[in-house]
Design a protein with these regions (language model features):
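Two-component system phosphorelay core
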Residues: 1-52, 56-115
């Protein structure tokens, strides 16, 4: 299972099911947008912004229990900091493939949470 339920369960306790559902939907939308943006930043060799966006994605995905995505984002961040375009491209391809699957799994988890 790619989704660690512990941070999700804690957020539901903290903000309630309805608010969490809204936050999670926004997170899914934003994550998909960031993944696309990372590709553009890599193509533009905008290392600083690529690293910044990967860093933000790392923390956001970790907050929603998507630790595999967070780990890949950390690798992209490191590659960007070192200006290693080939390594960033490899990790971005992994991120793109994994994001679709993990976000679909998160969507399934959301269906189990009472709003």
């Amino acid at each position: 299972m790619a989704v660690d339920r512990r941070p999700i369960d804690q957020m539901v306790l903290d903000v309630g099911g309805d608010a969490f559902q809204r936050l999670a939907r926004l997170f899914e939308e934003e994550t998909r947008g960031v993944v696309v943006a990372l590709g553009t930043l890599l193509n533009d060799q905008d290392w600083r912004e690529l690293g910044r966006q990967a860093h933000s994605l790392k923390h956001a995905t970790s907050s929603f229990g998507l630790d595999d995505l967070a780990a890949i984002a950390a690798l992209i961040e490191g590659a960007a900091d070192a200006h290693k375009g080939a390594e960033a491209a490899v990790q971005l391809a992994r991120l793109e493939a994994k994001a679709d699957a993990d976000l679909a799994e998160l969507d399934g988890v959301l269906k189990t949470i009472d709003a």
